Amino acid sequence: MSKSKHAVELCSLLVDDIYGELSSRIFTILLRRGRLPMNALKRHTQLTTRQLKLGLTVLVRQNLVYHNSEGSDTHYEANIDAAYALVRSGKILEIAEERFGSVAAEIMGQLVLLGHAKISDIIAELNKNHEPHANGNSNETNGATNGNGVHSYPSGQLNHTLIQLLEEGFIQPVGQNMFRSPTDSYNAVEKALLQDSYGGATRGTKQKDELRMRIRGQLQELRAQVPNWKPVGYNRSSTNGHTNDIASKRRRLSHSGGATNGYDFGDDESSKLDGNLVLRINHEKCTVFMRNRRLVELANSRIGVTTSYIYAELLRLMAEQIPRCRPDPRIDDAVDDADGPSIIITTQELTDALSKTINVSTGIGKATSQKIDTSRLDKLQNGRKRKAQDEAEVEGVASSDEESEDDHKPFTNGNGHAMDVDEDDPFSDQPGANTSKRAVTFKDRDRTPPPTESRQARMMHVMSHLQLLAADDCQLLRKCGARQMGEWTVDFERVIDRLRESELDSIIYENFGQIGHRLVRVMRKMGKLEEKHIAKLALIKQQDSRTTLVNMQMHGMVDIQEVPRDTGRMIVRTIHLWFCDEDRVTSLLLDRTYKAMSRCLQRLDVEKRRKANIIALSERTDVQGQEEAFLRPEQMNQLREIRAKEEDLLGQICRLDELVGIFQDY
């Protein structure tokens, strides 16, 4: 995350809102001043040593500040990525609840509040929060509460949920190296290798490359040095949930009893976790889950619900081998071949892992062969294949995207068309828009259980859905082999690039209208162009295009380059080329997004200050849950008003966070 002015302001507001003014003051100084020792930090913050230690304790516990001891001095450095991750706490809890139920959400919530904590402390806090209160809200009889009260969770259930969260990567054990910044770790490893193996300095390019490779290897070992959380004799459970709405609903409904998904929460000593094990939230892995959810929403909107369920399960299988969205260039090895899939899922593996509650025969258009036009699809696939072959010939390697003739079987989407394609206008503002009525009747909403079908037929239906995903314009999937009825992979960089391009087009369309959208698409495809050529290609009057281009330049969406025809550099002998630098536009939009999020937080703080008395009254323990009985009608109206404003502002922050994820993190 960049340390721009608005990004620093946003992270400072987040820390201040959750952890108070003292922690926010220290964190802001570290963000603006950089890495500082205790004496310099004391001088800039004008705080006492005791106040600094209290604030740093909170920040270090939340991993908001790195620390590294060099001799007698300890240097502190702000972790801006962990500060921004506070925005996504609600999304992380929501995903955990969808996957594993309310117990997992409460465990994750405790880790959000505590930062890192021992398992015994987490269990104690959960049981403490679920103790019955003698305030009239619950009646305790023989050590149990009634249906309106609260209850404590069995230790076996909490242990099983913790194991599930550890298996999927939502949480991770805390290692000693996690408290040191990546820069300090790199410098320490480099210094040790230089002194031990190279006499203090390297000589020549060969030794520099060798040193770089050895540093990368040791950094990978340091990152993998985390405490082993698996008990002796532990076996991975086979009760992992499926990422679909049906399984999630069944899982949540079953939490009222003593078992979940048929699992008996007994005190199994062979799989009991160590109570002294320290855990924290793995934000890098949680970002992978948020990216998967965004891609599933994209597949749902472009193709259909059933296909999105299958795509979600495929992404879940791939996520088991993806520790983070963006690799660290100083630690992770670079991929030489961009088309070389590192993670492959076969149709057979996906079918076996798919939940039986999903009727895979629905969501696929059923039309006669006479009504299916596959010419456009064949043309697109042949074009992709030729492009891949040309790139492979240039690089001197064979293309990995070759497919057999059996792969070009006719398949359609729900509207009876082979795929969404542009019309004759190459710069249409709404490509692939089809407003005609559906020609096929679906049974997606049929609540009857799916009919029994053979395994081969189910695999064929799954393969049809995968072919729909592969044929989509967003390239949601790519076929890379024919083993076990097809091998599939996801080129995340390409998919996110298309998603980023779509979001950018939407923003430009909303702010500059149809003409601005067409002009940007022309410049994106053709590159730098003169004004008259842009107007000609976009089929727009030159006067209209000039007005829109100037307006977009004032807002930073496009830029202009002056190219003189001769050395005289006269204005009449100068060519003005318009272009759209998407990297610059993305950086500009990110900065404006951070500014909008910080303004939302500031507005929320102002609204809460205005209604501070009502909020304090509603937060009393004897009033919570019974506001209507204790508050007057005018007080209830004020409370509803402030809660509605809070919901609107926080919802806007979450929507803006989606843009940050698309443009930067995914």
From Swiss-Prot:
GO terms for cellular component: RNA polymerase III complex. It is found in: Nucleus. It holds the Pfam family RNA_pol_Rpc82. Keywords: DNA-directed RNA polymerase, Nucleus, Transcription, Zinc. One of its GO terms (molecular function) is single-stranded DNA binding. Disulfide bonds: none annotated. Residues 593-614 are annotated as: Leucine-zipper. Residues 130-153, 375-455 are annotated as: Disordered. GO terms for biological process: DNA-templated transcription. Residues 135-153 have a biased composition (Polar residues). The keyword Electron transport does not apply. DNA-dependent RNA polymerase catalyzes the transcription of DNA into RNA using the four ribonucleoside triphosphates as substrates. Specific core component of RNA polymerase III which synthesizes small RNAs, such as 5S rRNA and tRNAs. Component of the RNA polymerase III (Pol III) complex consisting of 17 subunits. Belongs to the RNA polymerase beta chain family. This is DNA-directed RNA polymerase III subunit rpc3.
